[in-house]
Structure formats: C-alpha cells, structure tokens
C-alpha cells in the first residue's frame, strides 16, 4: 500500500480516504486499540485524500467538483443561452447526474411584492384614525386642525413652547411625537397652567389615515421635514369666551407622506370632502414572490425553438430530442415524490413543494370558544372624579395633611368588553377565504379609480369581498368547502408554505442579487455517464418573469414591473473518483453496444390537452387507429386555460399570470369536476367489460342523486370509481379495502388527497315558512359590525339575527343532506393491461380476446361540471418513453428514442 509520505499534498478539501488503521504502523494501531476506552483517537489520523488511494495521477479526478466556464453565451430579450465545452480526458468518466448550472443575476420582484400581512407602519392605530393634520374644508376652503398635543411645557411665547425656559428646537427632533406623559398619574395631575405642543402636517399634505402612514427621515435626529421647507408654529387656545392666551402650539411641517403597504377603502366624494379625514385604511394583500419549486420554468424543456444540445464534437449528433407532448417538469415532480418526503425542503435545488392550508380549503367551522368574557380596562383602573378629604362626616372642611385633590371612582371599574375569539375567527375567514373568492363576487371601492387590467396587483389589491358569503355563522358546526371556491386555485395563497419558503430564502426585499444552483431534469442526460471525448453542451434559460417566478396572488408580474437579469451561468460537474484501470475497464464496457445506457422517462406519457369552453359539459376525444401494445392506461385532470402557458413558445404574450402552473408543478385542484367518462375502442370492442357495478365502456365518477346507494365514503363518488382508483394506485380492491402502505401513499396519491364532505341545509320543500333571504337583507351581529364587509366600521343597532336557520337543537328546521368531495393534487387514473389480448368482456371462459396486432381507434367522452371560464382537459396517455444512449467512439454520442404506442416520429439522431 502506498504510504502517506508518498502521496501528493492536495491543496483542496476531500471528504473520504483511508482509515488510520490502513497506513499507521502496527504498533500505533495496537496502542490505539488497547487504550480506546479511555484515550480515543477516533479518526484523528484519517488520511486526507479521496478514494481511490492509488493509480490516480491527475488532480481533476480527485476534485470534489469542477467549474466549467461557458465558451459562448447569448443574452436576448427573452432567453439566456450558454454553450459549454465538456472535455473528458482518458481514464475518466463524467457523472452528468452531478452537474448543475450555477446562475448569478439580479431580480426585481416588482412593487407588487409584499412578503407579510398587515402593515409595518403604525399597525396599532385604529384603521380610520387620522394623523396630526390640518386640512381644507368648506366652500371657502378654511383650515381645520385635528391633532393630539403630547409634549408638556411651562410657557408659550413667540419662540413656541418652552420647557424650563428653553424653547423647543424643531431641527433637533423637538417636539418628539414618540414621547409624552409617561404614566397615568402624570395624566391625572397635569395642572391647568401647563402648555402643550406637538407636530402637525400642513394642509397641503395628502390626507391619509395614521394606519400605514410613513415619511422617511430627512435629518439624523429623525425629523421628516421636506428639504427646502420651513416648520411654522400654529397657536391654539381653548374655545371659550374668556380665553385669551394659547395653551397649545403646533409645529406644522410638510413631509414626504406615503402609504407603502396600505390603501384606502373609499375615496372622497364631491359632496362632502371633509369625510376624507375619517377614511378607513386597509393593508395591502400579502404577495410572496420567489422562484418556482425545483426552478420549474427556468430551463426550456419540450420547446422546439429552444431545444437543448448534448453532442459529440466528432459527430455533432444531438442526444436531446424534445417532444411537444412530453412533460419533463411534471415527470420530475412525480419522480421526486417517489424518492423523497416532499414535505422536507431542500434549498439547494429550491425544493419546497406548493401547499395550501387545509383549514382554508375546507372550513371546519367549530364556532368560537368564547365562554370567558374578555374585558379592556382603563390604564389606571379606578375612576378619575376629583374629591377632597374632609375632617368629619358633617361639613366640608379639608382634613389636615392631605392634598386638595383626590381621585375616587364610584361603583364597578369601567370596562369595555370584546369577544376576542370571535374577532380572530372572523379575521381568519376574511383574510384567508373571503379575500381569495372569485373576482366576479367582489366589488370596487367607492370613489376609487380602478385599473382596467384585471390581472394587475393594483386591481386585485383594491377589490373588496362582500358581506354574507364568508361569515362565522355560515355552515357553522360543519366541515365543508365554500362551493363557489372549489374551482379557485388554493395554491395561489399567502399560506402556501412552499412558496413562502422559496420567497424568504431570496430575502425580504424587492431587489435581489441571487445566486442559485439549477439541476438538469431531462431524462436522457440527467443520469448519463459521459465517456472520454469532447462534447458540446448548451441550454437556454428563460427570463420571462411570469414563467420563472411564482406569486401568491398570481398577478401579471410583467405588467407589475418585475424584471430578471442573468449575469453569468457556470456549469459544475464531477468525475467519478476511480482508479485509472477501473475507469478504463468501465469505458471499454460501456463502449460495447450491448451495454448501452438506457433511461426511462418517469412519467412516460404522451400529454394532450383538449379545450373546454366556458359552460360546456361534454368533451369528446378521438384517437386514430393504432396498435395499443405496451399501453399502460390514462391519467387525466382539468386545468384552467388562464393558468396554462404555451410551452412550445419562447415567450407567450397571452400568459398574464404568475401563480402555480398545475400541468407543470402538479398543483391540480379541478379533478373533482368530472362526472363520468366513457371509453370505446372502435364500435365493437366492449372494454373494460361487464365485471364492474356499472355500464360497460363507461365509468361513472360521481352522482348528484343516488337513489340506489352506489356512492361511498359519505361523498357522492361512486363505489365503482373508488374501486378503480384504489386498484390503479395501490392494487387494493379484490382483497377488501384498507389503507395503503406508507411507501405507496405519496403526495400525489389518491387516499392522501381524497376529502369527502357532507353538510345539512334547510329542506325548502319540507319547510313551508322558509325564505331564501337575499344577502343584502340578511343580518347577524347588527350594530356590532358593518353592514358591509367586516373591514369597515361598525354600524346599526342590536337586534335579533335573521340568518342562518337553526339546524340543531329544539328549534331545528327540516334539513336535507348535501355531499361532495375534493381530490386536489391528484390525477384520476384508469389502468390498462399491458396484455391487450385479454381485456374484453368477462365470460365463463375468461375474457374475450382482443388482437394486439390489429389497430383500434379510440373514442372517449368526458362529462364535466360546467365552469364560467375556459379550461383544458389534460390527459396523460401512459406509454413507454425510453432512450438508448450509445457512445461507440471517442467524442461520439448517439441516442435512439423509443415510444409506443405514441411514436415520437423520427427520434433517432
């Protein structure tokens, strides 16, 4: 064995090597073993060289990783293309599975980026409370002032307020708006001779509520006076006949007033501009923005115009053959799910799966636990009525040794009651559910100019959810999803923990200098062993912010000012750390045609989309005659056209959306909208036969009326369809029903995502006195909240509620049961036997034979729930998508793609 002294002294870190017992002298090894219990050496003498320990003469094979700089780059408006020269020397093997693109650039997430809820400025203020301000009012535009004077002094003269005969200095931060009387005792004993001062905004400043108001400092002392303007003193005296001298001085100034993260809920009307002082502010909606899960959309896949290249320089044959109907991104998502627990995040590859809060998608309205009353008390607790202590019970002569004023409260301590649990629950429902309802249900704020483009953040942010639809009393006691929100993308939400994580690892600012590592996902080369030779490797990267970035609200990031710049792309790779003779043996073996490297795309599907116009309920699908040998079945779901970009295009100008992209990242949520599907091979072939509960050639998925009791699991899914899904996912069915093993119950599996729902509603046919009162006429909590959305101020009078009708207790009304289900993150599956010759109708002699050698056409008909927007039927025809990579000689790489029964055409390069 080579001794340590003969080994080269590497100048870089290694992580493996010989154990100490392999190269230390026998005496030292024996001593270490004998004394290990009380003097442990551990790996103190580990040899710092990576395996193998001999027959390696170049440091390139020993390095943990190599950086490869591009030989050419092309930075265009929509793409950034790089070309690398891969040189694999003799007796070395490059591991393409270890490669990744190291990308540096600058990201502007745009003004719509807001990575938090609420406001960062004066968040404790009431929503309609004003700043200290002066404003013009009336026909003659006279000035009115509303202010809180917080600084106490002794005298007021032409120099303003004086404290201990020293006048306040506005340039030194005086009067300080953040200071004042320090405790309630000082407030009780101010004294009639005290004078007060504070700062106030001049009348030509914008009128904004204090909640959310901000002005940046213009002085090291924290003052905010605009440069080039002066601070003027405004004197105030009490409004009385005999009052002559002012007791308040206000220091008026102009500041750079802004509302960085709030907006007004209404605007000034022409009839009474004074009301604008009492306008209510609301926080801007949170909008996390980050790269997509696994950097989906950053690299071009399945795009003819931006096809990648891996070619040997000796032959120039490209090993990358991309198909329009192959879905590399979705395949990678499913592959990861089969390997890892996707609930674990891995920042290196930006792996943080999109999720949603189940409490938002499915509302378990348990009411509120408000058994204990919550009170709010005055800071001093007791009352503040002035009294004096007297000597006896008869007469008012002041007692000796007492002050002339005492403070006595009468009766119980004054208090205000607030139902904190009910307010928290109402706030949760409004912020997490009502804010995300479809735009058709929302209204514009009054007297506010709204943008015309409904895909922008400015429009989405200012739309207001109406009252009555999402309330604490709706479906109380039930577990039910809001019907009109079942078709709203639940992953476009600020409680998407994966997106929030991906946004936060970039930081909390709009402008980001990013440095990311992006893996190769294309199945033909992502695990390839590249043998000695010179190769050209190039790929294109998108710069379209709607494709590369993801936002909580799904707004059009292009229109909202987001920008992406790529400054550099380097390739990092590793050689297998093999001894030369081992590497040469491996190379000789792989050069042999019988040892070609064969890879299978994990999804192995031909993906097809069929448009479903708004309101349509039936979708026909026709597949021309072909040989169906090696066909595995169908997976299908439904996706919105608005959320589906044109992947074949370098830049889709009609894709004005940045939320989750279901057909790329597997955030499916419309799978529950299918009612039935029929499958016909030609006209004479009966498949899947009569071995099920329902009609041959047809799968009934759900029933709205179930007179025969064919539904299952307290939902309206049929037993037949439930059986098909259990069989296709877990091979569970013939042996009874049970939960699948943990290793089969993955993120995108059936049982994990099947959510049956049931509730009761008033049976209007059995209840003669039932009235379906319109939303505007329903009231509950009248007087204690706004008649409109709960974000406005309270109004009205206390009165018995008229909604909802009671469904339990002695006063329960006659009710009927409604059932449904959700099955998000899942594609329905229909399996198909690989032995197509035994798939016909079941008889006493077995199944009828179909002939694989003859071609059959396919007719499918899908019945779906109608939706108010255009969607796609998204089908995966599950086939075998394989590639065979052959490297017969140095610098030559050949690829043969095989796909049956949906051929890839001329897939040989």
UniProtKB/Swiss-Prot annotation:
The record marks 733 as: Involved in interaction with pre-protein VI. Signal peptide: none annotated. Pfam families: Adeno_hexon, Adeno_hexon_C. GO terms for biological process: microtubule-dependent intracellular transport of viral material towards nucleus; symbiont entry into host cell. The modification Phosphotyrosine is found at residue 897. GO terms for cellular component: host cell; host cell nucleus; T=25 icosahedral viral capsid. The keyword Phosphoprotein applies. InterPro entries: Adenovirus_Pll_hexon_C, Adenovirus_Pll_hexon_N, Adenovirus_Pll_hexon_sub2, Adenovirus_Pll_hexon_sub3, ADV_hexon, VP_dsDNA_II. One of its GO terms (molecular function) is structural molecule activity. Keywords: Capsid protein, Cytoplasmic inwards viral transport, Host nucleus, Host-virus interaction, Late protein, Microtubular inwards viral transport, Phosphoprotein, T=25 icosahedral capsid protein, Virion, Virus entry into host cell. The keyword Acetylation does not apply. Gene3D superfamilies: Adenovirus Type 2 Hexon, domain 4, Hexon Major Viral Coat Protein, domain 2, Hexon Major Viral Coat Protein, domain 3. It is found in: Virion; Host nucleus. It comes from the Viruses. Homotrimer. Interacts with the capsid vertex protein; this interaction binds the peripentonal hexons to the neighboring penton base. Interacts with the hexon-linking protein; this interaction tethers the hexons surrounding the penton to those situated in the central plate of the facet. Interacts with the hexon-interlacing protein; this interaction lashes the hexons together. Interacts with host dyneins DYNC1LI1 and DYNC1I2; this interaction might be involved in intracellular microtubule-dependent transport of incoming viral capsid. All late proteins expressed from the major late promoter are produced by alternative splicing and alternative polyadenylation of the same gene giving rise to non-overlapping ORFs. A leader sequence is present in the N-terminus of all these mRNAs and is recognized by the viral shutoff protein to provide expression although conventional translation via ribosome scanning from the cap has been shut off in the host cell. Belongs to the adenoviridae hexon protein family. This is Hexon protein. The gene is L3.
């Amino acid at each position: 064995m080579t001794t340590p002294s003969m080994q080269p002294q590497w100048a870089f870190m290694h992580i493996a090597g010989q154990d100490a017992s392999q190269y230390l002298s026998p005496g030292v090894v024996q001593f270490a073993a004998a004394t290990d219990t009380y003097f442990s050496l551990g790996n103190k003498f580990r040899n710092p060289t990576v395996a193998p320990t001999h027959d390696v003469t170049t440091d390139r094979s020993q390095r943990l990783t190599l950086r490869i700089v591009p030989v050419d780059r092309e930075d265009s408006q929509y793409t950034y293309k790089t070309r690398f020269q891969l040189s694999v020397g003799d007796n070395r093997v490059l591991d393409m599975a270890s490669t990744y693109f190291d990308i540096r650039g600058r990201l502007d997430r745009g003004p719509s980026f807001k990575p938090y809820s609420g406001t960062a400025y004066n968040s404790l203020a009431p929503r309609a409370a004003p700043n200290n301000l002066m404003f013009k009012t009336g026909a003659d535009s006279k000035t009115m002032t509303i202010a809180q004077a917080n600084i106490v002094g002794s005298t007021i003269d032409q120099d303003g307020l004086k404290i201990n005969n020293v006048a306040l200095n506005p340039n030194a931060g005086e009067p300080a708006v953040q200071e004042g009387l320090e405790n309630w005792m000082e407030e009780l004993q101010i004294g009639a001779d005290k004078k007060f001062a504070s700062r106030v905004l001049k009348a030509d400043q914008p009128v904004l509520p204090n909640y959310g108001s901000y002005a940046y400092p213009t002085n090291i002392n924290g003052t905010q006076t605009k440069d080039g303007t002066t601070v003027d003193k405004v004197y105030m005296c009490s409004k009385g006949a005999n009052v002559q001298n002012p007791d308040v001085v206000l220091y008026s100034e102009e500041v750079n007033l802004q509302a960085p993260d709030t907006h007004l809920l209404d605007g000034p009307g022409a009839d009474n501009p004074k009301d604008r002082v009492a306008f209510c502010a609301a926080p801007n909606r949170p909008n996390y923005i980050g790269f997509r899960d696994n950097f989906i959309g950053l690299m071009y896949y399945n795009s003819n115009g931006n096809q990648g290249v891996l070619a040997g320089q000796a032959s120039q044959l490209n090993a990358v053959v991309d198909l329009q109907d192959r879905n590399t991104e979705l395949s990678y998502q499913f592959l990861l799910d089969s390997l890892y627990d996707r609930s674990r995040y891995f920042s290196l590859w930006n792996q943080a799966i999109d999720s949603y809060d189940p409490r938002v998608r499915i509302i378990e309205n348990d009411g509120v636990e408000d058994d204990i009353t919550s009170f709010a008390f005055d800071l001093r607790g007791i009352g503040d009525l002035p009294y004096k202590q007297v000597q006896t019970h008869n007469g008012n002569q002041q007692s000796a040794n007492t002050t002339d004023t005492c403070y006595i409260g009468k009766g119980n301590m004054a208090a205000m009651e607030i139902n904190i649990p009910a307010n928290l629950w109402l706030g949760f429902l409004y912020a997490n559910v009502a804010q995300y309802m479809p735009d058709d249900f929302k209204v514009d704020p009054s007297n506010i100019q709204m943008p015309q483009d409904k895909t922008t953040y400015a429009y989405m942010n200012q739309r207001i959810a109406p009252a009555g639809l999402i309330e604490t009393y709706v479906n109380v006691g039930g577990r039910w999803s809001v019907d009109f929100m079942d078709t709203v993308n639940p992953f476009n939400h600020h409680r998407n923990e994966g997106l929030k994580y991906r946004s936060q690892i970039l930081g909390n600012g709009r402008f980001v200098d990013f440095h990311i590592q992006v893996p190769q996902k294309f199945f033909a080369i992502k695990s390839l062993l590249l043998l000695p030779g010179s190769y050209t490797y190039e790929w294109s990267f998108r710069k379209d912010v709607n494709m590369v970035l993801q936002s909580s609200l799904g707004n059009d990031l292009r229109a909202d000012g987001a920008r992406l710049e790529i400054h550099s792309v380097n390739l990092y790779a590793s050689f297998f750390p093999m001894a030369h003779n081992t590497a040469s043996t491996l190379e000789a073996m792989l050069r042999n045609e019988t040892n070609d490297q064969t890879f299978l795309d994990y999804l192995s599907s031909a993906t097809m989309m069929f448009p479903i116009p708004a309101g349509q309920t039936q979708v026909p699908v026709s597949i021309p005659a072909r040989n169906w040998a090696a066909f595995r079945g169908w997976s299908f779901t439904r996706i919105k056209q608005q959320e589906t970009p044109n992947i074949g295009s370098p830049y889709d100008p009609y894709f004005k959306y940045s939320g989750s992209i279901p057909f790329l990242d597997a955030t499916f949520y419309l799978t529950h909208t299918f009612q039935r599907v029929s499958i016909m091979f030609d006209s004479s072939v009966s498949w899947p036969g009569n071995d099920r509960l329902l009609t041959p050639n047809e799968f009934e998925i759900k029933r709205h009326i179930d007179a025969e009791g064919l539904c299952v699991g307290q939902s309206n899914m049929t037993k037949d369809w439930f059986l098909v899904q259990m069989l296709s996912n877990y091979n569970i069915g013939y042996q009874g029903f049970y939960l699948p093993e943990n290793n089969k119950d993955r993120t995108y599996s059936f049982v994990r995502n099947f959510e049956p729902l049931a509730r009761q509603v008033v049976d209007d046919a059995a209840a003669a006195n039932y009235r379906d009162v319109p939303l505007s006429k329903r009231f509950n909590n009248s007087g204690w909240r706004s008649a409109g959305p709960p974000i406005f101020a309270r109004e009205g009078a206390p009165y018995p509620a008229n909604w909802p009708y009671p469904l339990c207790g002695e006063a329960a009304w006659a009710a009927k049961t409604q059932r449904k289900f959700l099955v998000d993150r899942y594609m329905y599956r229909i399996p198909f036997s690989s032995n197509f010759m035994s798939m016909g109708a079941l008889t006493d002699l077995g199944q009828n034979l179909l002939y694989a050698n003859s071609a059959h056409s396919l007719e499918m008909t899908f019945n779906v729930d109608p939706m108010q927007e255009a969607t796609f039927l998204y089908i995966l025809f599950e086939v075998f998508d394989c590639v065979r990579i052959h490297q017969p000689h140095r610098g030559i790489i050949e690829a043969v793609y095989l796909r049956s029964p949906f051929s890839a055409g001329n897939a040989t390069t």
